[in-house]
Amino acid sequence: MGGHGGSTDSSTASGTDFDVIVLGGGINGAGIARDCARRGLKVCVVEKNDLAKGASGANTGMIHGGIRYLMYDVHTTKMSCTDSGYIQRIAPHLLFRVPFIVPVMKPQGAGLLQTMMDRLLLEGSEVFFEAYDVYQPLKRGKPHTRLTRDEALALEPGLNPNILGAVTMDEWGIDPFRLVVENAIDAVEHGAVILTWHEVTGFVKGSDGRVEGVDVQDRLTAGATTRRLRAPVVVNATGAWGPRTAAMAGASYQLRPGKGVHIVYSHRISNYGFAITGVDGRQMFLMPHENGSIIGTTDDDYYGDLDHPRATEDEVKYILQAARDVFPGIDQYRMSRTYVGVRPTLFTWAKNEDRLSREHEFYDHEAQGVPGLISVAGGKLAAYRQLAEEVSTEVARRLGNTVACSTHAAPLPGAEGPIDVDGWMKDLPKRHRLAVSRMAYRHGSRSQALLKAVDDDPRQACETCLCEPVCEAEIRGTIQTEVVRRLVDIRRRTRQSMGACGGTRCAVRTSQILLEEANLTAVEQLVELQGAMDARFIGKRPVLEGANLATEELNQAMHFLGGNLGPLFRAARLLADDAGGRAAIGIGAPADAPATRDVDGIVHHRTQATAIVVAPIPGDRP
């Protein structure tokens, strides 16, 4: 599967000299690329998967100060609150307030002494939040409010009634995928080249050991040759993979990778967030996010496969135990899936995982005899811009560039103009308006450009996904402009298939759009479909038990066999051979279906209103 959309085509970068090559397409890599590109540097980003595929897309989705860091990492709290304020100014369309209720649980006991201890516990909690209030203005946060037991239960009747009272806390939620993507888009619009699904196969070195570039290979194009990219500075921002990447160049540094697991619910449990505590004292959150709710995160040292971290049933039970203590009715809600990330936490010996610093550092490997290579470690989503500024300033200094950083003031794509959701929706049928309002949240002022396609083809206003309202115009525009190469890439940019259906309703139609826009073959389309279904099951597996697990496994089999994906694989391969390499999986009314021929006795699956059809596409594939 080849690249498309300029910024993903490695042929445009082959043999080209850059000022800086950034390895890693997470929030740190995208932030560094944006900062360097806006200073006029020629930048290339190399990411072996998709943007935000790792920890950057697997966090709690908040740009917060981190109240728990007040006890042992005050500088991180202040820095995160400061950068949160900048992010709010440069990307207001991506943000939403999350009002938190922090319950103070009543300890076991009775008598006068216990009454005194209860009062001390309440007073101590309020003093703690008064300290956090000092930093709230930096991120436009509201000061805390102390609630009585009755006031807290009136706000959220689902709370455990065994509370002394509660304290409120104001935080900001964000779509982390969009934050990464919009940093990357801005970098591209300032001249950067972004190569997703490209893997570094080696470092290019001079006779003095200086790093002068990297060799990369396209992971999606069969038979792709290795391409050489050159630059005097290479930044290793590959997160938890960082030490492994540095070792390829003969350099080294240490991290303490931390595994974080979240549980996702497809519906809102409450409109408030809650601070919850694990049995071991770890603080987590139960909070509304987008159209659903999430609970997490765990924090455990991780020694496993960085490419395939998995949530376990024990981790799910640990999270639910903590949630149940504050919100006893949690078991009444159906869990949708889990997601997992591995943090590139700074290495420290003899500290519990949740006490590790969330500070960031970057290392110059010249002292190890590997000049030209800089490695980035640590950091938080809320402080990514500060990290990027520090690294980019060092890169610019080495290259003699004196242009100042502008990322704290320059708006991200979508924040440049007014957002007139009501105006955009007035000419659309009511059933499509929710999708447009959600589009405005993801794309801001640039939604207007996406909606121009609806003027030419009103059918593009139709929703392709009902769980997470997404219209066809957004899907096509995303493929054309946002470094999309695979079906799962669309998921990260639009949240399509992140809802309750997990892609069951929308994956086939979306894959057809990807085929049309990205010039896929039918076999590639089917590979994308199966990959999306596999990813869906991996996320759902840890939250399923007993009969639910058996039912889901049956659903997987029915989706693959009943939906004709198995026979369609064989049909597509044969038809592609007959049609010079091109065939398509089409969806439409049976009367509109293109002509087909039988392969293995099964060509298409018909329902009452639709048909899935494999058909050759005339002409050679470009």
List each language-model region with its residue ranges.
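Flavin (FAD/FMN) cofactor-binding and adjacent substrate-gating region
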Residues: 107-190, 195, 205-210, 215, ...
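Dinucleotide-binding Rossmann-like beta1-alpha1 core, especially the glycine-rich loop
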Residues: 61-155, 284, 422-434, 551-552
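C-terminal catalytic lobe of FAD-dependent flavoproteins
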Residues: 186, 247, 252-261, 265-270, ...
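Flavin (primarily FAD) binding-site architecture
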Residues: 236-250
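Beta1/beta-strand and adjacent pyrophosphate-binding region of the FAD-binding site
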Residues: 14-26
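Rossmann-like nucleotide/phosphate-binding core characteristic of flavoprotein oxidoreductases
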Residues: 153, 162, 394, 398, ...
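Core beta-strand elements of the Rossmann-like FAD/NAD(P) dinucleotide-binding domain
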Residues: 16-18, 222-233
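Glycine-rich FAD pyrophosphate-binding loop
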Residues: 37-57
